Every structure is written in structure tokens, then in C-alpha cells.
From Swiss-Prot:
One of its GO terms (biological process) is fatty acid biosynthetic process. SUPFAM superfamilies: 4'-phosphopantetheinyl transferase. This is Holo-[acyl-carrier-protein] synthase. It comes from Magnetococcus marinus (strain ATCC BAA-1437 / JCM 17883 / MC-1). Its main location: cytoplasm. It holds the Pfam family ACPS. It is found in: Cytoplasm. NCBIfam families: acpS, pantethn_trn. Its EC number is 2.7.8.7. GO terms for molecular function: holo-[acyl-carrier-protein] synthase activity; magnesium ion binding. It comes from the Bacteria. Gene3D superfamilies: 4'-phosphopantetheinyl transferase domain.
Length: 138
């Protein structure tokens, strides 16, 4: 069963500006996990903002796919976007976001994610599917 589909578009220059301002570190700590920060900070200067922009777009896309928005105690850092061994972007949910999904959609959940960038824009599309737990025989 499809839980939802979400997408988001982020202007990379906007993230560059945020990172270069005095509150850039606070923004990173509020929106990205330590592992995400390590990944993006390891990139060259031009690619650093793009890395963050893709992950920010991905987090927004996942929240849109959940259909709840950032409320009910859900945080950006509850959604972690990292590459797997082959470089494919994967989503791991933590905290209240993971609890909300498990409560409202029990079963095996798969989050499919696509990230891209072109001409100063980063885009993410997320599709969340849930295979409900089999009902126990009566």
C-alpha cells in the first residue's frame, strides 16, 4: 500500500547563503544529523551546499509523503539521508518520526528516495510504501 508521495525543490544558493551566515552552524545542528554533516562537510566547497540542499529537499519530501508536516514533535534530524554502500540515497527514521510511522502504518515500511540537482536546484522525490502485518488467524 502506498502511504504517500512527496517531492521538494531547493535553491542551492539559498543553502549556500544560510551556511555562510553567522547562524549557519545552528541551522546545521537543527536540520542535519552528525553523520549527514560529516558527509557534506567532507565535500569540496561548491559541492558542500549541494549535498545539504539535496538532504534538506529529501527531508521535506519524506514529511510530505507522510502527510503530516513538521508537527506532533517531528524534527528534521529524525529523518536521516545517507548513501548506502553503492551510493544510493537511503532514509532512516529516528525518534518521533519513526514512532509516528510505526503507529499509523504498522508493517514493513519501505521509503524510496530519488535525489538530483541541475542548474542551481536540488530536487528530491520520496515514495513511502507499507506492507501491513498479516492478520493472525482466529
Amino acid at each position: 500500500m502506498i502511504v504517500g508521495i512527496g517531492n521538494d525543490l531547493v535553491e542551492i544558493q539559498r543553502l549556500t547563503n544560510m551556511l555562510n551566515k553567522g547562524h549557519g552552524q545552528r541551522f546545521l545542528e537543527r536540520c542535519f544529523t552528525q553523520q549527514e554533516q560529516q558527509l557534506c562537510n567532507g565535500r569540496s566547497t561548491p559541492q558542500r551546499a549541494c549535498c545539504y540542499a539535496k538532504r534538506f529537499a529529501a527531508k521535506e519530501a519524506v514529511i510530505k509523503a507522510l502527510g503530516v508536516g513538521f508537527r506532533q514533535g517531528l524534527w528534521f534530524t529524525d529523518i536521516e539521508v545517507l548513501p548506502n554502500q553503492l551510493g544510493r540515497p537511503t532514509v532512516t527514521l529516528h525518534g518521533a518520526t519513526a514512532q509516528w510511522l510505526a503507529c499509523h502504518h504498522p508493517g514493513q515500511v519501505n521509503i524510496h528516495l530519488s535525489l538530483s540537482d541541475e542548474k542551481g536546484l536540488a530536487i528530491a522525490t520520496a515514495l513511502i510504501e507499507c506492507h501491513p502485518l498479516a492478520m493472525a488467524p482466529s
